[in-house]
């Protein structure tokens, strides 16, 4: 039975929920920096995702720099961590920098991964869940 009062209480405490533990005891955590952390079943961070949703091309380089800073910190803590950038605006300049940037393991266009019928969506899901194996 659903209790609407309980639901309101849970929604009121939404800031307390930082993530989810999957059935295989891996976790997906949400925070300010990095935006998303992927933890294996030992609690080790194996992936970091930065989401940059700004659509203004003039700010694309700044958003890339902010993501890079977060990735550098994650790599400083664990040199084996995979870093994934998800951005809605990747200019040609940012694209060129990403392609030569060793701190970024993979990157995806936010608009394209929001469509379940896109190849980018499939690649993104595969990338994330390859870090959180079901074993």
Regions of interest found by a model, annotated:
Residues 2-135:
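Catalytic core segments in nucleotide and nucleic-acid processing enzymes
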């Amino acid at each position: 039975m659903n209790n609407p009062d309980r639901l309101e209480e849970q929604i009121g405490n939404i800031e307390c929920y930082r993530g989810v533990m999957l059935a295989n005891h891996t976790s997906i955590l949400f925070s300010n920096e990095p935006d998303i952390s992927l933890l294996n079943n030992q609690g080790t961070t194996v992936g970091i995702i930065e989401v940059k949703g700004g659509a203004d091309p003039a700010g694309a380089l700044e958003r890339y720099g902010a993501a890079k800073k977060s990735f550098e910190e994650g790599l400083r803590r664990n040199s084996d961590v995979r870093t994934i950038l998800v951005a809605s605006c990747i200019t040609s300049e940012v694209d060129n920098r990403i392609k030569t940037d060793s701190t970024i393991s993979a990157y995806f266009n936010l608009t394209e991964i929001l469509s379940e019928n896109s190849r980018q969506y499939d690649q993104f899901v595969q990338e994330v869940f390859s870090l959180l194996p079901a074993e």
